[in-house]
């Protein structure tokens, strides 16, 4: 999809750059593949804010997307490509030969009328899903499982992908777009191609109101607060905060590592995404 820029006939259109969605389905989603979505506003079960800067936004229906692709050896035809407000990527409605319908993540270069299939070994075409044991080395993939049968977890956002770079015993080596090189079991499923909507990161929403429609609230700087609210707060006049940048709870921010070094999956990471910063 291309980008649309606007002649600024109103202040909210100045600098506005949006995704051109003219080729997407303009109707409502399939009712049987949707469910209600309750807004949490960043609160947990006790009503306390656990995720700041969330709240409001337009009402949404959740589209049930098939991340597992477990309907093997049954061909499906793409009926339409749809917008999904719950993710940055587009989704494709597919109808299987037995009449069942499903939503899947739409990869780039997948069009209406195309055939897709999930199998132990299938053609290397966008939208086809198979385990790494059936993929040739060098393939660009998305929607990658970390555990067999759990459903895709890696490379699901707009424009993302990973490259299958090698085999190591019962594992497949994949290079992620972050630069990380990691192992996953060869039985894990992956879908051929890169995720649709690669221009998503080039959007400019133009005004604060459009961001509010997406359910995001303002991000207030600590130095603009009072001392009771933030370690950087207070002071006479404008101050720099007076210390290294910290979170509202006094922990170092801007670069501090938060991943547990003893995490079980650490041994599956061959090369860290931070390696390029360390000059390795």
Curated annotation (Swiss-Prot):
GO terms for molecular function: rRNA binding; structural constituent of ribosome; transferase activity. Residues 270-280 have a biased composition (Basic residues). GO terms for cellular component: large ribosomal subunit. Residues 221-280 are annotated as: Disordered. It comes from the Bacteria. Gene3D superfamilies: 2.30.30.30, Nucleic acid-binding proteins (2.40.50.140), Ribosomal protein L2, domain 3 (4.10.950.10). One of its GO terms (biological process) is cytoplasmic translation. Keywords: Ribonucleoprotein, Ribosomal protein, RNA-binding, rRNA-binding. NCBIfam families: rplB_bact (TIGR01171). One of the primary rRNA binding proteins. Required for association of the 30S and 50S subunits to form the 70S ribosome, for tRNA binding and peptide bond formation. It has been suggested to have peptidyltransferase activity; this is somewhat controversial. Makes several contacts with the 16S rRNA in the 70S ribosome. Belongs to the universal ribosomal protein uL2 family. Part of the 50S ribosomal subunit. Forms a bridge to the 30S subunit in the 70S ribosome. This is Large ribosomal subunit protein uL2. It comes from Jannaschia sp. (strain CCS1). The gene is rplB.
């Amino acid at each position: 999809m291309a980008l649309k820029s606007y002649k600024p006939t109103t202040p909210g259109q100045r600098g506005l750059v949006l995704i051109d969605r003219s080729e997407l389905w303009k109707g409502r989603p399939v009712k049987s593949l949707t469910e209600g979505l309750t807004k949490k506003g960043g609160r947990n079960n006790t009503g306390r804010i656990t995720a700041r800067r969330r709240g409001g936004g337009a009402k949404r229906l959740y589209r049930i997307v098939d991340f597992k692709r477990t309907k093997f050896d049954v061909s499906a035809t793409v009926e339409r490509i749809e917008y999904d407000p719950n993710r940055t990527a587009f989704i494709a409605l597919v109808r299987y030969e037995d009449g069942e319908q499903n939503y899947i993540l739409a990869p780039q270069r997948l069009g209406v009328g195309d055939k897709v299939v999930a199998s132990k070994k299938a053609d290397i075409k966008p939208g086809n899903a198979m385990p790494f044991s059936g993929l040739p080395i060098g393939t660009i993939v998305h929607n990658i499982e970390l555990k067999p049968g759990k459903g895709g977890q890696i490379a699901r956002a707009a424009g993302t992908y990973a490259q299958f770079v090698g085999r190591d015993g019962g594992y497949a080596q994949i290079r992620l777009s972050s630069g990380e090189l990691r192992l996953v079991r060869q039985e894990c499923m992956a879908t051929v191609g890169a995720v649709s909507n690669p221009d998503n990161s080039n959007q400019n929403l133009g005004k604060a109101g459009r961001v509010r429609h997406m359910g995001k609230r303002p991000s207030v700087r600590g130095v603009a607060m009072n001392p009771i609210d933030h370690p950087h707060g207070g002071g006479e006049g404008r101050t720099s905060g007076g210390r290294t940048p910290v979170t509202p709870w006094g922990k170092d921010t801007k670069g501090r590592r938060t991943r547990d070094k003893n995490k079980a999956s650490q041994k599956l990471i061959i090369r860290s995404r931070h390696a390029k910063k360390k000059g390795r």
